[in-house]
Regions:
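Conserved MFS/SLC helix-loop-helix module at the cytosolic interface between two early adjacent transmembrane helices
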Residues: 72-110
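Cytoplasmic helix-loop-helix junction between adjacent transmembrane helices
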Residues: 117-153, 342
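Helix-to-loop junctions at the C-terminal end of transmembrane segments
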Residues: 73-85, 274-287, 372
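Helix-loop-helix hairpin linking two adjacent transmembrane segments in secondary transporters
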Residues: 142, 151-201
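A late C-terminal transmembrane helix in Major Facilitator Superfamily
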Residues: 340-375
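Extracytoplasmic
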Residues: 21-56, 74-77, 163, 242-247
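Extracytoplasmic gate region of multi-pass secondary transporters
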Residues: 41-45, 222-276
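C-terminal transmembrane helical hairpin of 12-TM major facilitator-type secondary transporters
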Residues: 267, 271, 285-336
Length: 402
C-alpha cells in the first residue's frame, strides 16, 4: 500500500455509521487522561518524595511499572476492541483510572503506591492513544489519518494544559489532595464522554485483503511485521531517551536550566507542527519509504544534537526539528498496521506492535541515565542513540508485506 486510501484497508463504513461526537470527545478525553494519569506525575514527584521520604528511584520505578503493565495489557485490550468496539473498554478504563489515581493519592506506603500505579497501567492501556486510534480507524475508514491527526494534535496539549494546572494546585494543596482533585476531574470529564460519545454501532471488520496472510496470527508471525516491530521498538527506545536527556545535554552545552526547559517545551510544539504535516507526507510517499525516512531523520537530529557544540539558539532549533520528527513518528506508528495489513485486525496487531515500544519507552530513561557515565557524557549518549535509530531505519526496509 502506497497511500492513505489504500483500497485493501477500507472499512466499508460510511459517514452514517460515524458517530459525530466521537472525535471531539476523544480529543477532550485524551487531553484529560494523558494530563492527569501521565503528566501530573513528573510535576508532583519531587513533592511526593519530599513528603514521604521515598526515593526518587523508587517512585519513578512505580511509574515505569505502570508503563510496563500498559504494554502487556494493551494486547488483550486490542482483541476486545476488534470484537466489541471502544465504548466499554474506554469507559471501564476511565473508571479504573479514577480508582487508581485516588489510590495513588492516599497510598499509605510505597508498596501501596506502587500497586496503585500498576493499576493505573491498566487504565493507560484502555484510555490512551491505542483504543482511541482503534476506534477512529474503524469508524473513519479511508479518512482515518485526518481523524488520527486531529486527536494526536489534541493529545499534544495534555502537558500544556495539565502540567501548569497541576503545579498551580500543588502550590495551594498537598500532593495527595492535588491528586484527589485531579481524580474528580478525570471522573467528571472522561467517564460520561466515553459512555455517551462512543455509543454508535461497531461496524464489522472488513475482509482481509486477498493478497495478505489470513488471520492476525499469520501477520504477527510474518517477517515484515517482526522487522517493523523491531524497528519501532529501537526507535521508541532512542526517542524516549532523547526526550529525557535533552535538558541535561543542553545544560552541559552551556544553556541555563530555564532555557533548556524551554527547548524541551518548544520540542513539544515541534511535535504538534510535525503532526500537521503527516497527511501531506503520507499522500506523497509509500509506507516503507516514509518509515525508513522518518526513522533516519530521527537519528539524524539526534546525531546533530550530540555533535553540534552550539550556540544554544542553534541547539534549540535542533530540538524543535527533533520534535517535528517525533510528531510524525506518532502518526506513523498509528497507521503502520492499516497501511500494510488493512483494518481487519487493527486492535490486536496494533496492540502487539505497541507493547515492545511501550516497554522500550519505560526502560529508556533508566538505561539512558545508566549509560551516560560510562560513555563519558550526554553527547556520547546521543551519538549512541543516533546509531540505534539508524539500525531501526535499516530494519524498516524489510517491513513491506510481500
Amino acid at each position: 500500500m502506497t497511500s492513505l486510501d489504500a483500497r485493501g484497508a477500507a472499512t466499508g463504513t460510511g459517514d452514517r455509521s460515524r458517530p459525530r461526537a466521537a472525535l471531539p470527545a476523544l480529543c477532550v478525553t485524551q487531553i484529560t487522561s494523558w494530563g492527569i494519569v501521565y503528566y501530573a506525575f513528573p510535576v508532583l514527584n519531587a513533592r511526593i518524595t519530599a513528603d514521604t521520604g521515598w526515593s526518587t528511584t523508587a517512585t519513578t520505578a512505580a511509574f515505569s511499572g505502570a508503563l510496563l503493565v500498559s504494554a502487556l495489557t494493551g494486547i488483550p485490550v486490542g482483541r476486545i476492541l476488534d470484537r466489541r468496539g471502544p465504548r466499554a473498554v474506554m469507559t471501564t478504563g476511565s473508571l479504573i483510572g479514577v480508582v487508581a489515581v485516588l489510590a495513588i493519592a492516599y497510598a499509605p506506603d510505597l508498596a501501596s503506591f506502587t500497586a496503585a500505579w500498576l493499576l493505573a497501567g491498566v487504565a493507560m492501556a484502555a484510555t490512551f492513544y491505542h483504543p482511541a486510534f482503534a476506534a477512529l480507524t474503524r469508524w473513519w475508514g479511508e479518512q482515518r489519518v485526518r481523524a488520527l491527526t486531529i486527536v494526536t494534535l489534541a493529545g499534544g496539549l495534555a502537558s500544556t494544559a495539565f502540567a501548569p494546572l497541576t503545579a498551580l494546585l500543588a502550590e495551594h494543596l498537598s500532593w495527595r489532595t492535588t491528586y484527589a482533585v485531579l481524580a474528580v476531574l478525570l471522573a467528571v470529564i472522561t467517564i460520561p464522554a466515553h459512555a455517551t460519545a462512543l455509543r454508535a454501532p461497531w461496524p464489522p471488520a472488513p475482509p482481509q485483503p486477498a493478497r495478505l496472510p489470513h488471520g492476525s496470527g499469520s501477520v504477527a508471525r510474518s517477517r515484515p511485521f517482526l522487522l517493523l516491530a523491531a524497528a519501532l521498538t529501537l526507535n521508541g527506545f532512542a526517542m524516549y531517551a532523547v526526550v529525557i536527556a535533552l535538558v541535561p545535554l543542553l545544560t552541559e552545552r552551556g544553556a541555563d536550566p530555564t532555557t533548556a526547559a524551554w527547548a524541551l517545551g518548544l520540542g513539544g510544539a515541534g511535535q504538534t507542527l510535525g503532526r500537521t504535516l503527516y497527511t501531506s507526507l503520507a499522500r506523497r510517499t509509500a509506507v516503507t519509504t516514509r518509515t525508513v525516512a522518518l526513522l533516519a531523520l530521527g537519528g539524524g537530529t539526534t546525531a546533530l544534537l550530540g555533535t553540534v557544540p552550539g550556540p544554544v539558539p542553534l541547539l534549540v532549533v535542533l530540538a524543535i526539528a527533533a520534535g517535528m520528527v517525533r510528531g510524525n513518528l506518532t502518526l506513523l506508528q498509528a497507521t503502520a498496521v492499516t497501511d500494510r495489513w488493512g483494518t481487519t485486525h487493527y486492535g490486536r496487531l496494533s496492540g502487539l506492535l505497541a507493547a515492545p515500544v511501550t516497554v522500550a519507552g519505560a526502560v529508556a530513561p533508566f538505561a539512558g541515565a545508566a549509560l551516560t557515565g560510562p560513555l563519558g557524557g550526554h553527547a556520547q549518549l546521543f551519538t549512541l542513540l543516533a546509531i540505534v535509530s539508524a539500525c531501526a531505519s535499516l530494519l524498516a526496509v524489510g517491513s513491506r508485506p510481500g
